[in-house]
Structures are given as structure tokens and as C-alpha cells.
């Protein structure tokens, strides 16, 4: 059976704001099965935001584990991310999960992968999913040449450019901005 997957998630820090957004399309093989899937979630009363790409069931499993880690470590996002990455890499069950996550708060952007990586970007941009390279390229250009835009506006424009190019990305966006 084919998996439901494919998406674009992008996060940007710009002028003191951090925003994250994702498109809403879910596909099964080469067929669109749903136009609006919410792939960005608020955690810790909106203080932490999480975007995910990959197998939906796997992503939700990881999201639940990440939320548990956030609670265990009193909202310390970086510590929770590192502990999740350790578990993800070493646990026999979790190791088989096929998803990636971007987590953000008012200060940090982190990418968490199943290979045990927790990556903090040098350029204040992270992206995952099928249209990630289009969104990341657009975000880099916007940060360099459209500095008057806010972080949420840059996320929207980056996703829009990715959706124009990537067949697995649509224009139904959910965009959130981290709060203090």
C-alpha cells in the first residue's frame, strides 16, 4: 500500500519574529486525497510551534513524543528536541518512523530528523518536504531582497512559490508565528 505523504513546511526568523507554515495537500501515490491537512501545530499554549512532513501517522506519533518531552523538560525546546532525536534513533519502534519535524519558539528554529540530527540553521531558514528546496530558495531571496516583509509574509510567499512549482504542494496554507 502506498503512503499518504508529500508536503512543504518552511520556517523563517526575520526582524525578531519566527514564523512557520505548511501547505495543506495530502497525496496517496500520485493522487491528491485531501486539500486541507493541518501540518503546523501549536504546543505549550502557542509558545512552541511544530511543522511536520512525511507519513501522517508517523508524524503524529513523533509530535506526541515531542510534546511529552517538552512537558518533561519544562518547555525547554532544545533539550526536548535532543531527547526526542536520541529516542528516535535508538528506539526499535521509533527508528522505523518516516517523518521530519521543524520546531520553533520565539528564539530558536530546529530541524529534527530520524537519523538523530537536531539542526539549527545558520541563515534563519528551515524547510522540509517535497517542495522544501523551492521554499528555501524563495525564503533566502526574500530575506536578502525583500527585507520590508514580515516573517509570516515571507513564509506565505515562499510557500506560494513552492506551490507554483511542486505538484505535491498546494496553496492552502497554515501559518503561525511564535509568541513569547
Swiss-Prot record:
Annotated catalytic residues: 7
Domain of life from the UniProt record: Bacteria
BP-aspect Gene Ontology terms: proteolysis involved in protein catabolic process
InterPro entries in alphabetical order: ATP-dep_Prtase_HsIV_su (IPR022281), Ntn_hydrolases_N (IPR029055), Proteasome_sua/b (IPR001353), Proteasome_suB-type (IPR023333)
Chain sites annotated for binding Na(+): 163, 166, 169
Keywords: Allosteric enzyme, Cytoplasm, Hydrolase, Metal-binding, Protease, Sodium, Stress response, Threonine protease
GO molecular function: metal ion binding; threonine-type endopeptidase activity
Database matches in SUPFAM superfamilies: N-terminal nucleophile aminohydrolases (Ntn hydrolases) (SSF56235)
Function: Protease subunit of a proteasome-like degradation complex believed to be a general protein degrading machinery.
PANTHER family referenced in this protein's UniProt entry, alphabetically: ATP-DEPENDENT PROTEASE SUBUNIT HSLV (PTHR32194:SF0), METALLOPROTEASE TLDD (PTHR32194)
Family statement: Belongs to the peptidase T1B family. HslV subfamily.
Subunit field text: A double ring-shaped homohexamer of HslV is capped on each side by a ring-shaped HslU homohexamer. The assembly of the HslU/HslV complex is dependent on binding of ATP.
NCBIfam families membership: ATP_dep_HslV, PRK05456.1
Protein name (record): ATP-dependent protease subunit HslV
Species assigned in the record: Cytophaga hutchinsonii (strain ATCC 33406 / DSM 1761 / CIP 103989 / NBRC 15051 / NCIMB 9469 / D465)
